[in-house]
Amino acid sequence: MLRMSLPSSRPLWLAALPWALAACTNVPSAPTADNSSASARPGLVRSAKAATELLAVTASMELIRFQADQPRQILQRQRIQGLAKGDTLVGIDFRVARGVLYALSQQGQLYTLHPQQGTLQAVGTGGVALPTGSFGLDFNPTVDRLRVTGPGGLNLRLHPDTGALVDGDAQQPGLQTDGRLHYATGDAYAGRQPDISAVAYTYNAQNNQLTTNYAIDKTLGTLAVQGSLEATQPQISPNTGQLHTVGPLGLGPLADVSFDISDVSNQALAAVRSLSPSAPTHLYQIDLATGRARMLGVVGDGEALLGIAIAP
């Protein structure tokens, strides 16, 4: 990837190499069992001092790149190519196990997305019909599956090699989605319909079998845990759809929000646009212990974003 004359602690060609190789090679098969306990992540060598970089999809279907400490400075802007006519992307994320950027469309088609060229390549022939609305998506690093949340409590997983729906209940005929999103009994918002439009998983460097699925409720403006915190008992799977509120972001209700957690540092970042008229998109750092958001700056010229992904 070109660094666009921005100073970096990594050589330019070395920084570009992982993405270039990932986009030009065949993706190896992932574990077929969704509850696989095998590590999905090969060893990666990275500079701990490198600035956190993000890719984002704009509402005008452009792929932009910027750094967390200077979000206003757009380092790359590329028109996204290969999307079916009338379709739009609803989110992006890097597949932790392979370092490949994935995108999901409103029509339920999964793609790989070239991080420099902005070109899409379809994965399979369409995984699932999606309702209209805002979606969250993020790869679970322990089992290499793509979590998708959306309107009406939608909660499902997609297989990254086929784009197909992962069966949420093998005991029932046909393919089932996972349990509907709902706030747990005793939660401050129990009985209220969630509006989870952003999700992200942590990465545990000491034990890669552990992860926590965090979620942001756009209507409430709150951070929640989907399932249970890693290494706590009893363990509750995100597949149940059970939500436990962490706390408010401190921003009020949101027009849109995108969310990701770094698999290097577990830094949690969210791109947020408030309900205020003509509100720009700001980048925030999220405290996973409290939910509180700390502003880092406006992203570019403040345009609306449909998804962000922290670069590996």
Per-region residue spans from a language model:
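Sequence/structural signature of beta-propeller domains
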Residues: T25-P312
